[in-house]
Swiss-Prot record:
Organism field: Arabidopsis thaliana
Keyword annotations: Chloroplast, Lyase, Magnesium, Manganese, Metal-binding, Plastid, Transit peptide
Superkingdom as given in the UniProt entry: Eukaryota
Transit peptide boundaries: 1-52
Protein name per the record: Inactive terpenoid synthase 20, chloroplastic
């Protein structure tokens, strides 16, 4: 078929997207990302290659994916609406008592309480109150920390202020360090403080070794070492912390009861949402309409959405995001693991035109694209009464940008081309899908106005840095599988080619860059001026990638996150 050239037409050559090269990714802070790395339109003048030829079909990059977690255990669970309503009334009664505590405490006590509210997953009930208190308290933070020698207290203060975008310097920990930068040896037995310091900063753990005499503290430490608070999903951390807090000797019974009731309230909402998504998936009936080349990830995609926003008021938003992720996974697998190059070109062309029949392609691909188009129409129905149709149009534009990038990767894989690392990253930061995920996360949020979507489209450094970190995580986690299905244009391979290093050296460098970009994400978190709630959504999308890819490809090999998913859906918290 014709290829993409400077004026937007198609040819058999590779797609050229954005600037020809990026500056070196060392250091990453010097990187300047293109705001428009892909041509806005792809235009086909005529098709010259049959997309159904036997030769092409014989060269499909077939790959057998592991099954979904969605089995009878998940399909059999249900939520009683009367129980949800009863829990809601209990929450309102307890919320008033907790709110009184916030008002009556002195500054340090209040910050410790805010830390508990965040850790227990109930801070969202008091967001406005908390933000107002911290705005005033931060003006006196130096006096608050003066003479404070309790490392646990300093760690709590540090975490709370930074979480609410008050940039408290990590220099507050210098008082606990030797001249060489190590923590004082006398602190090494204070496991709780060191755990909190590690969790709040997300730094490499160099100081704590050995076990704990307190079993529940030992379990908490293991959780933090597996995924720090900067990396883990809030909903998972809340579930873990409630269990930890219950075993603390001096826990507050009112807070504990409030947290348990609130979490079960959320869990029952998640169960209802899963039922909605499963019903939609069954009615879609893609399993009988398209070849079985793809991952079915309904419950896993809802878990992703829960990690982006866990609050009950975002139930519709989670359903919108989950459905989008389910279809994206299937289309991503179409490009990566099934379609031929002419088919990939045809699908992308039809996607650009937002039609199923503009360019000839197999019926199963028409069904898939029609499913996506219909889903976007459903979303328009959800936001029409709010006057936010523009939000879905922004989302559609992000789909097109994403699939143009996927086409480029497909071309590289099908032609055996290995670009240099800089060329690869221009495309790779798009195929990571952070931008499209943030866009669809915003669609269901009434508070996300046109300015929020303009912010995404401006390609702010905050999101671009999350893009980069996510791309690096994904490249490390998926390298072996991508090689197995013939995708030789991987980040690792491209880095080895450009810098003439071994595979082992490339992996070490990728891990170093992941650590470095994590610091950059934190820096940009404080520089970004859009509303805090929206910034946190983007930040949480990055956390989703950490949670699912730090220890392997959790979307493909769902056992990696199976324990977390089970704890949220199947293990309902006891009150």
């Amino acid at each position: 078929m014709e290829a993409i050239t400077k004026n937007g037409s198609l040819s058999q050559t590779l797609v050229h997207c954005g600037p020809k090269s990026l500056s070196s990714f060392i250091p990453v802070r010097c990187l300047r990302f293109s705001k428009n790395p892909f041509p806005k339109k792809l235009v086909v003048t005529r098709a010259r290659t049959s997309i159904n030829s036997d030769h092409e079909a014989a060269n499909r990059p077939l790959f057998q994916f592991p099954p979904s977690l969605l089995d009878d255990r998940f399909l059999s669970i249900s939520a009683n609406q009367s129980e949800i309503d009863s829990l809601g009334r209990d929450i309102e009664a307890l919320k008033a008592k907790v709110s009184e505590k916030l008002v009556c405490m002195d500054v340090k006590e209040r910050i410790h309480l805010i830390h508990l509210l965040v850790s227990l997953g109930v801070a969202y009930h008091f967001e406005k109150q908390i933000e107002e208190f911290l705005k005033v308290d931060f003006e006196n933070v130096e006096d608050m920390n003066l003479g404070e020698e309790d490392m646990y207290s300093i760690s709590v203060i540090f975490r709370v202020f930074r979480l609410y975008r008050h940039k408290l310097s990590s220099d507050v920990f210098n008082r606990f360090k030797e001249e060489n930068g190590d923590f004082k040896k006398c602190l090494l037995d204070d496991k709780k403080s060191l755990t909190k310091q590690w969790a709040s900063r997300g730094n490499t753990w160099n100081y704590f070794v050995g076990g704990s005499n307190e079993e529940h503290l030992s379990g908490h430490i293991k959780n933090v070492l597996y995924l720090s608070q900067q990396e883990n999903a809030e909903v998972v951390m809340s579930r873990e912390y409630i269990q930890f807090y219950e075993q603390e000797t001096h826990h507050d019974e009112t807070l504990l009861k409030f947290a348990k009731i609130n979490f079960k309230f959320m869990q029952l909402h998640y169960v209802q949402e899963l039922q909605t998504i499963v019903k939609w998936w069954k009615e879609l009936d893609l399993e009988s309409k398209i070849p079985n080349y793809y991952r079915v990830r309904a419950v896993e995609c809802l878990y992703w959405a829960m990690a982006v926003y866990m609050e009950p008021q975002y139930s519709v938003a989670r359903i919108i995001l989950s459905k989008s992720l389910v279809l994206w996974t299937i289309i991503d697998d179409l490009y990566d693991a099934y379609c031929t190059l002419p088919e990939a070109i045809a699908f992308t062309e039809n996607m650009e035109r937002w039609e199923t029949d503009a360019i000839d392609m197999p019926d199963h691909m028409k069904v898939l694209l029609r499913s996506l188009i219909d889903l976007m129409e459903d979303f328009k129905g959800e936001v029409r009464s709010e006057g936010r149709l523009y939000s879905v149009e922004y989302g559609i534009d992000e789909w097109k940008r994403l699939f143009r990038a996927d086409l480029t990767i497909s071309k590289w894989a099908r032609t055996g081309y290995i670009p240099n690392y800089d060329e690869y990253m221009e495309v790779g930061i798009v195929t990571g899908g952070v931008d499209v995920t943030v866009a669809f996360a915003f669609i269901g949020m009434g508070e996300a106005g046109k300015e929020a979507f303009d912010w995404i489209r401006s390609r702010p450094k905050f999101i671009q840095t999350i893009d980069l970190k996510s791309r690096l995580r994904d490249d490390v986690a998926t390298y072996k599988d991508e090689m197995a299905r013939g995708e030789i244009a991987t980040g690792i391979n491209c880095y080895m080619k450009q810098y003439k290093v071994t595979e082992e050296e490339a992996f070490l460098e990728f891990h170093r860059r992941i650590k470095h970009t994590s610091k950059l994400v934190n820096e940009e978190y404080f520089k970004t001026t859009v509303p805090l709630k929206l910034v946190r959504i983007a930040f949480n999308v990055g956390r989703v990638i950490d949670t699912n890819y730090k220890h392997g490809d959790g979307l493909t090999y769902t056992g990696i996150v199976g324990g977390q998913i089970t704890s949220l859906f199947l293990d309902l918290i006891t009150i």
